Amino acid sequence: MKYLAAYLLLTVGGKNSPSASDIESVLSTVGIESESERVEALIKELDGKDIDELIAAGNEKLATVPSGGAAAAAAPAAAGGAAPAAEEAAKEEAKEEEESDEDMGFGLFD
């Protein structure tokens, strides 16, 4: 993900076809070591492709993915009673909050 983010930053900045050294340079400015194999694989995959078209195609694919998280949470409540399901949901929310607070939002490129 960090390699793709660096690639996109370079393309938004006006570099139409970023090289491996460009991507590695962007990553090194924020203290991230890069793996040249992964950088080369990314460049190979994106070579000759329009970024805007790739983003549009990705958005279309994401739109078709069902997001049934709410339906799955409602099913145990209907089958097993509201009290245990509510207690379980509260535990899950507390656990998710702990996990999301661990990096304080600074783990963008980790």
From Swiss-Prot:
TM ranges: none
Name the record gives this protein: Large ribosomal subunit protein P2C
Positions where Phosphoserine occurs in the chain: S100
Family: Belongs to the eukaryotic ribosomal protein P1/P2 family.
Signal as UniProt keyword: no
Subcellular location as annotated: Cytoplasm
Pfam family of the protein (one): Ribosomal_60s
UniProt function note: Component of the ribosome, a large ribonucleoprotein complex responsible for the synthesis of proteins in the cell. The small ribosomal subunit (SSU) binds messenger RNAs (mRNAs) and translates the encoded message by selecting cognate aminoacyl-transfer RNA (tRNA) molecules. The large subunit (LSU) contains the ribosomal catalytic site termed the peptidyl transferase center (PTC), which catalyzes the formation of peptide bonds, thereby polymerizing the amino acids delivered by tRNAs into a polypeptide chain.
Example GO molecular function: structural constituent of ribosome
Major site of localization recorded for this protein: cytoplasm
Additional remark text: Yeasts contain 4 individual small ribosomal A proteins (RPA) which can be classified into two couples of similar but not identical sequences. Each couple is distinctly related to one of the two A proteins present in multicellular organisms.
Region (Disordered): 83-110
UniProt feature, compositional bias: Acidic residues: 95-104
This protein's record includes keyword Zinc: no
Subunit structure: Component of the large ribosomal subunit (LSU). Mature yeast ribosomes consist of a small (40S) and a large (60S) subunit. The 40S small subunit contains 1 molecule of ribosomal RNA (18S rRNA) and at least 33 different proteins. The large 60S subunit contains 3 rRNA molecules (25S, 5.8S and 5S rRNA) and at least 46 different proteins. The acidic ribosomal P-proteins form the stalk structure of the 60S subunit. They are organized as a pentameric complex in which uL10/P0 interacts with 2 heterodimers of P1 and P2 proteins.
GO-annotated cellular components: cytosol; cytosolic large ribosomal subunit; RNA polymerase I complex
Keywords: Cytoplasm, Phosphoprotein, Ribonucleoprotein, Ribosomal protein
PANTHER family per UniProt: 60S ACIDIC RIBOSOMAL PROTEIN FAMILY MEMBER (PTHR21141), LARGE RIBOSOMAL SUBUNIT PROTEIN P2 (PTHR21141:SF5)
Biological processes, Gene Ontology terms: cytoplasmic translational elongation; transcription elongation by RNA polymerase I
InterPro entries, per database record: P1/P2_N_sf, Ribosomal_P1/P2, Ribosomal_P1/P2_euk, Ribosomal_P2
